[in-house]
Amino acid sequence: MKQFRRVMLFLLDSVGIGALPDAEKYGDAGTATIQHTLEGNPGLTLPNLERLGLMKIPGMEKFATGAKPQGVYGKCRELSKGKDSIVGHWEVMGVPTRMAFDTFPEGFPQKIIDAFTKMIGRGILGNEVASGTEIIARLGEEHQKTGFPIVYTSADSVFQIAAHEETVPLATLYQWCQMTREMLDNMGFGVGRVIARPFVGTPGNYVRTANRHDYAACPPEQTDLEILTESGIQIHSIGKPVDIFPEAKFTSTVKTSDNFIGMGEALKAVREKEGLVFINLLDFDMKWGHRRNVAAYGAGLKAFDDYLPLFQDAMDDNTLLVITADHGCDPTHTGSDHTREHIPVLLWHRGITPGAAGIRETFGDVGATILKALGAPSPKVGNSIL
């Protein structure tokens, strides 16, 4: 395998490709994010992803048009327990989660709420499992009258704090979240993420803003990102990776508010950066998957597909393109939570020999491939696909 100057890793957040064998345990039997999105959007085609091999991946054959693959293609099983962003990202970077994070299907225990309210000096609203947009619509007006933050969770391991930007300044909300991260760690609760969920607007017209910020738990072991750094190889974050890996020493970070900004920043980075450029495109998950918007999810896939030729044209001979995901969020499934699925993996560089990578045993094969491509030592978990 040749060495590359840079690897461009696009992680399409929640773009799963079919239920894992144990999906039924998670209430996700039969889920298939990409497949059901295509079925729910008659006439939708993804010709550029198909050229990379997407429709040759097991489970995608019915959508094939006969285009000859030009890349390496496959899908990965998950070793970790769980189905959220932390678990998926960590395993992609070589650290499967052996113990599931704590979840709170009945809301947070009183001792957590008591500690939180004492810490911030005021009460709370909520403390329930809820959709973010729904609970803001329901409790937003009371929040603005009282100044009490809205605290809620989901099926994932998250402690979410919502506040109106004119009622609780962003700096205060972020401080609360950082303090909560430390509080939960000190209390011995394994919570994957504390998330600031700011919103604006008036009663009946509240909308969440792009000022979300995640405060993630630190991985229990060294990730592939540290291996790259210790090898003298740069790592760059576009979007969410810097929030998911708080211990990583990113050479540069760029915040993004939507997929289009992320894709634009990636186009600049492929011309300017070296090492690993890690791009998370979050709209698939946050704006369309959780909201079960099949049409918008399809439009998002189409927008990325349309972008691919422009991006590939900007790649030189020393650049490897990797496309993958972290979990599913099937927009046709019941509820609003993530779905436990395989993730796709598509690889392309100039001169690549096309072929099938099969069904891989761990998401960690993605990270292992990146390490090998950049000339770094092999990880403990994962085997290179190339």
Identify what each model region corresponds to.
Residues M1-L386:
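Feature captures the catalytic ectodomains and active-site-proximal regions of enzymes
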